[in-house]
Amino acid sequence: EIMPSLVGSEMCIRDSNDIAFKGKRSVEWSDVEKYLRQYVGDIYRIAETEDIIYIGTDLPDEYSGSNYTKHIKGTIAKAKANAVQAIPEMIEIATSKTFEDNKKNKHSRHAKNGWYRYDTRFALPVYDENGDVERYNVFSARLLIRHASSGKMYLYDVLEIKKETSKSCQE
């Protein structure tokens, strides 16, 4: 569900009944990778720019096994794992498109036309001891989009996930 936030921009809020990775002590990234495979072949549109974003076969592996993913822990790792359920909405509400040239030889074929980054936001429920939703934690993140030689833009990863302080929203 997409809702306006307390500060005026939109964010995606996950319903407490559909959190796939809740209550897990550590993230099983292979499960996240499997979950992401359902999106391969899907196409989404960013409302602000009307850019079309494709989901390619490289997303599940990159999202769950990137250097960024390997180095995150705790709340941020769980947030990234659960954000997979909100990918369509996170793409739709993305803002602040920026471009950067491809700098790595290993990406010269798949990101021949460089990279785009977009800001996005999502919120995840926090539960009390009874399993009821107590509040939502709000996160900001950057979508990393590769611009292929075909001219198509593909979601490659979600990076720079940060919990927004003092912006938790109440149910």
Task: Tell where the protein language model's regions lie, with residue ranges.
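Intrinsic-disorder/low-complexity loop/linker signature
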Residues: 50-51, 104, 130-131, 150-151
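Generic detector of low-complexity/intrinsically disordered segments
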Residues: 5-8, 126, 157, 161
